Amino acid sequence: MTFKESAINESFWRNFSKIYKKPALVNKYLAGHSDEIEKVVITNFNEFNLSSEYSIYANGGFGRREMFPSSDVDLSIVQHNKNSKNTEGLERYIAKLWDVGLKVGHSVRTIQDIKKVAGKDPVEFTSYLTRRSLISSPDIDIKVNDILSRSWGKKKFFNAKYNEQEERY
């Protein structure tokens, strides 16, 4: 499967002056671009028969269906158990996404890894909190949601996000 991201981006920039004047057109473009990328991500995930051992989530702009031209495709891949055998298939999957021209940023974690990182890092916690399921099972979604609900108290999370913003800006 080939992906024509450059054609999509060229179309966006060629029509930018018309699109920019109408926010609804911008939103339509961003969602459409996200949907095209999602098709590539899911089709290739299925091609490598990964769904029995992994779940895949969209994060960031991709997760919100707000893919701007040349944005990274942020993926969170959850390994169903630490003894998954198809790691080679997963590596080939990521390589294929790069080969078709996607700028993929990804993490591969077990449920236990998510518990550790989400409990310590408010950025990672927020990333998992705002994820969008592409291919997953209800069982995995429940486990991730359970981890997130136990990771941060409201006050602790607010303070961590406040400090993050202070450091960033």
Feature locations, PLM:
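Conserved catalytic core of two-metal-ion nucleotidyltransferases
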Residues: 34-42, 48, 76, 87-143, ...
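Charged, low-complexity surface segments at secondary-structure and domain boundaries
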Residues: 1, 143-150
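Metal-dependent phosphohydrolase cores
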Residues: 1-3, 26, 32, 77-80, ...
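Generic alpha-helical segment signature
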Residues: 5-9, 86, 158
